Amino acid sequence: MLTLAQVLNKSAARLSGLHPAVLAAATALIERSYAVGVPILITQGLRTIAEQDALYAQGRTRPGAIVTNARGGYSYHNYGLAADFALLLPDGSSVSWDMNRDENQNGTRDWLEVVQHAKAIGFEWGGDWTSFKDYPHLQMSFGLSLADLRTGKKPTAAAVEAVVERIKPKEEQAMRTQMKVAVQVNGRKIADGWLENGVTYVPARKISEALGAQIAYHPAANTVEITTIPQKGAIS
């Protein structure tokens, strides 16, 4: 059986280019699915406009079956906000789109187990669409329409934070498997962190709040910024 690290590595190339929050969510989905005995592979992440147009032509002006109704610019894949998945088979190299498969033999179809975890994280599922059902497709719109995205709009910091909050509970469970430590600022405990290989990890927001600083996430730059607030009477 493949290790979690091996399963994650198989999807690494296709996760490249995704919006940071979608990347975190897709990674969490791989981890949660693996934990219940359903390893998955991300088969598609970011898709360029040209690649989308070529896919749209399939079954229309090019050989093959129709697999999408979206032209270039009309898919969340084109903005790094969508990912497609398949079930990774026990041999570690083959995949399956069999929605009736129950490899972990728990009475629930593996495909739907993955979908349940995906929705809990905040993904929208293409299988819920009423017209063209796209069962491998998962996306996060962050409240933005495709028309919004075509004009250059980006997910807001608040929308991104909401996704992070949905992922956090499972991350905190994983945190407890490491060496738990109390993090203090000026003698006052502000949070529980964890120690791994000599490095202490703690939520940046807890540190900034304890220091009376402001914290902001800038999606376009994929940057978390902590800004200290000068004390009254301080000389700068």
Which residues does each PLM region occupy?
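Short aromatic/hydrophobic-glycine micro-motifs
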Residues: 38, 60, 122-126, 213
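Active-site acidic/histidine clusters and adjacent loop/turn architecture
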Residues: 1-44
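Soluble non-cytosolic domains of exported or imported proteins
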Residues: 16-24, 46-49, 104-112, 197-202
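Charged, often glycine-rich, active-site loop that binds/positions anionic groups
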Residues: 51-71, 137-147, 230-232
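Catalytic cores and adjacent binding grooves of peptidoglycan-active enzymes
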Residues: 70-172
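Primary recognition of N-terminal secretory signal peptides and signal-anchoring hydrophobic helices
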Residues: 165-236
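Extended, low-complexity, intrinsically disordered C-terminal regulatory tails
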Residues: 30-64
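Anion (oxyanion) recognition and catalysis
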Residues: 34, 119, 209
